[in-house]
Amino acid sequence: VYGKSVGLVPYIMPGFLLAKKALEVYRANPECEGLILIKHGIFSFGETARESYERMIKLVSLAENRLGKERGRSGVAPESRALAYPAEIAPILRGLCAPSRVDGDCQRMIATYRTTEEIKAYVDGEELSRYSQAGPVTPDHVIRTKPKPLIVPAPEDGRLEPWTSEVEKRLALFQKEYRAYFDIHNRRLETPKIALDPMPRVVLVGGLGLFGLGGSFGAASIAADLAETTVSVVTASERLGKFESIGESDVFDMEYWSLEQAKLGKSKGLPFDGRVVAITGGAGAIGSATAAAFRGEGAEIVLLDINQ
């Protein structure tokens, strides 16, 4: 696709060693217009900001054109069963995926739903259990999405009780596997880490789409945004071959790297974190003031009023 116009930098965790390797690759080919940092992304450069920008557009366009040649519809049979609405299962997923806290309470989660034809094809793909569990499309996604999403079956309309039981089983296995992943990689460190909660941040739902989960609507939206990006990247990769992520030990190092965790901006929780408050008469002065008060205490707000 690129020939000698770019240099290829092998995967190295972000930091001085990666910068040093990038310089080494550049010096070996000083005429290149950019560098592809494997599993990270692409950089372009030039004598001016405009030249650098135009080279980026060119390099990205070449990649898009290459992917376009392989573009085609994913062969997924339409779902013949009547399915439950996303709004019916969202509260179930919110409740089941709420991590326990040391005080015996739980960290309530907000869920946001996404679906497109591409997402539906992805979650209904025959090899979903392979490509969706391969790892993040770029390393730092892991702090928002966890190493892997939770996969749950399509929820049949009127049969949410057995569906919920199946989700509970899959969630228990997800947590068990996350704890094993942590234990395996933590024991090799000189300074052990403290385990994060083992709950998923992305849930793939057969027949419907995906949910992003987080302690706030913002965090849930970021998880969902990254999951959508993952769907697009993996779908494109699978048209050319098979998607591959970084190794599991590299995923762990990134997830538990203090500099990455600092991006989350953790702060002391507020009383209504993870709760949704519906306020009637929300368009009036009292309603809006009430909304502001609850929002100040961490709640996500739904304003309701009569349109007249």
Describe each model-derived feature in a short phrase.
Residues V1-V277, A289:
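Glycine-rich flexible loops
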Residues L270-I301:
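Canonical Rossmann dinucleotide-binding motif of NAD(H)/NADP(H)-dependent dehydrogenases/reductases
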Residues D305-I306:
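Conserved acidic E/D residue at the C-terminus of a beta-strand in Rossmann-like folds
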